[in-house]
Design a protein with these regions (language model features):
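Intramembrane alpha-helical segments
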Residues: 1-83, 140, 163-170
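Alpha-helical transmembrane segments of multi-pass membrane proteins
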Residues: 40-44, 87-92, 99, 157-164
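Extended hydrophobic alpha-helices typical of membrane-associated regions
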Residues: 140-204
């Protein structure tokens, strides 16, 4: 087990490293980065408050979609960044709901909330919806950014991967939920490759 002192020291190191990076950015990005602290500070409470803690995680964890753009451009283009942010948040909802199904019995016993418990037997319907929202957000953002044809091919492959996850996952099998959760590294790699290839093609 991790002691409170060790956890506090680790947190301090992480905050210090984050601050060091943030101070290298433009003023707009500094403000945007600092504004995420409200989400970071309140997220740990969400499992006690709402049936949708995974949604709050999505908003918190993917703030970098906004911050990365701002760090490069010094501003935000809402037509590019908002669909990307919502796409990433929807993806987080999908994979963290799958992850939460590993712990649903324990969560129910101790009285904490999750989308896995909230959706129950309808989980796969919700997962399909989150996958569709994530894909739509990526396509909208890519079109606004002027990405080339390889982007759309890559997103199609990524969408097929999400569809496989949703169709194939056994939500009552902890090991399978863990496998599907870990497979999101493949999904992320496909999206990254799609963006890079689309940017290179669009630049031409």
């Amino acid at each position: 087990a991790v002691s409170p002192a060790a956890a506090t020291a680790f947190l301090g190191a992480q905050l210090g490293a984050g601050l060091a990076v943030l101070l290298q950015l433009n003023d707009f990005s500094k403000l945007l980065g600092a504004s995420s602290l409200a989400l970071v500070a309140t997220y740990p409470l969400m499992k006690r408050i709402t049936n949708w803690p995974q949604a709050f995680l999505g908003l918190t964890f993917n703030w970098g979609a906004l911050l990365g753009y701002a760090a490069v451009h010094g501003t935000l283009d809402p037509y590019v960044t908002l669909p990307l942010y919502l796409s990433a948040a929807s993806w987080t909802l999908l994979y963290d709901t799958i992850y939460a199904h590993q712990d649903k019995d324990d969560d129910a016993r101790v009285g904490v909330k999750s989308t896995a418990l909230h959706f129950g037997d309808d989980t796969k319907k919700y997962l399909a919806g989150f996958g569709a929202l994530s894909t739509a957000g990526l396509l909208t953002s890519g079109a606004a950014a002027g990405l080339g044809a390889p982007f759309y091919l890559g997103v199609s492959a990524a969408a097929a991967h999400l569809a496989w996850q949703v169709r194939d996952v056994d939500l009552d099998d902890r090991d399978d939920c863990a496998r599907k959760f870990k497979s999101n590294g493949t999904y992320g790699g496909l999206v990254f490759a799609a963006i890079v290839a689309g940017k290179l093609a669009g630049a031409g």
